[in-house]
Amino acid sequence: MQLSTTTHEQATLVNQKDTYLLIVFDSAGTAVLVESQGNEYHLPKIEIPKFTRPAQEVTELLRNVWKLSSVFLFSGVVEESANASYFAVLESTDGLCLHPQGIEWFTIHHALSSLPFSKHECRAVRLSHAKLRRRIYKNSSEPFARLGWMQELKDWVDSNIRPLGMELRSLQQLNGCETFSLVRFATTQQPVWFKAVGEPNLHEFSISHALRKFFPRYVPNIIATKYEWHGWLMSDGGGATLDETSNPLAWQTAIATLADLQIESIGTIDDLLEAGCRDLRAPTLLELVDPFLDTMAELMNQQTTVPPPVLSRQELSHLSETIKDALQCLSALQISDSLGHSDFNPGNIIVGPEGCTFIDWAEAHVSHPFLTFEYFLSHLRKDYPTVVPFEDDLRSSYARRWQGCSSAEHVSEAFLFSPLVAVFAYAVAGNRWREQECVKIPQVPGYLRSLTRRMKREAEMLQRRRVECPN
């Protein structure tokens, strides 16, 4: 769930750029690409749009502009540099004969000992090369921070799809770091996808396999599993993502399919929790209300500017009572806990001719089902204005499914209490609020305070709705 931003703020974010120094090694790890201008030598520097996937943006830029095939290995923050914010380490898979104009290959030793690099460039190359050398062994806990892993992956994918009558054609690296990878492989038939996860999302590996076991109709088919990388190869969903269409029927189909999945999941709650789904059921949330709001009281006292308003202890106390009441009322309704998703956004919903499939379950949880519907609405209101007029139709589609196993009155009441509970559950789900190191990050306290103010607004609207519709 993301808070709304103004059109001006959105336009500003779209136009912002991140600057990256590129450290491109050859596949043997013996040479690095260096840009030369007369007697000056520097690491190449590029800009990519802010808030995008660096692995995808950087590798596509190198392919389209430099005509160079590359693999994104890892990235980091550049220290003591006013000219770049980050560095990206890549492997060129085209050999030493290919390089863009004005950029040459130099041996690592020569580059570090003889070229007039700046201090931060020299440090970045030296540390990156040392990191690659430490990751030579294949049993590393960081499998994607080493040279040659993509070729190994291609061979593994090829060996698993050939028996299915498919052959590899090309690949697109969409996301990645030392422990995480997302690669799309084009084949002679439909595409296949490889995904691997590490901490803090290691649970997605077991969750994805559990969902495939219990609900194969709703998730992509898993073709093969690479256990040592916590990765799996899956088939394509066979359609477009929901965010690519404004057809209200497609959106209604997606939300009705979500309800079907949730209803089917009711009998598998223990299995889902064992697989790693987060427990956001009412008893768990009730225990977190006071600890969370006590922490928010401390963060409110740290706020130095007004507006936005600082919530008083008394306001937080009233909010605590309202959240607890909403949780108790919601759990009293005859609607069972089910599978849910704290980031249920249209980009993770694939709409095909035979129905919908859902991908990316890192934020899977077990909770009251209507919380997931609220997260879906939050994305819709923020990013899809052309679909907002159909919100009532979506609500009706979702409600009709649940009225098959609960009364219409209980479904209506669940819609009353779920907006407030959804914001609270989202705020406490990741435990960032009680991790001292996390709270020290400048943006985190402000974000948590904004979520708390959002809860207060939802609590006030809940009280008004209960007065207007007492029955």
Residue ranges and their predicted role:
Residues 2-44, 70-71, 350-352, 357-360:
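N-terminal strand-loop-strand
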Residues 34, 171-188, 193-194, 321-373:
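Active-site acidic catalytic loop and adjacent metal/ATP-binding pocket
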Residues 41-43, 80-114, 172-280:
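ATP-binding pocket architecture of kinase catalytic cores
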Residues 43-77:
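The catalytic Nudix box helix
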Residues 116-171:
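Juxta-kinase regulatory segment immediately upstream of eukaryotic protein kinase catalytic domains
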Residues 131-149, 153, 276-329:
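Active-site catalytic-loop/activation-segment of kinase and kinase-like phosphoryl-transfer enzymes
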Residues 245-313, 337, 442-450:
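A cross-family kinase active-site recognition segment
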Residues 369-406, 419-439:
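Active-site activation/catalytic loop segments of kinase-like enzymes and analogous catalytic loops
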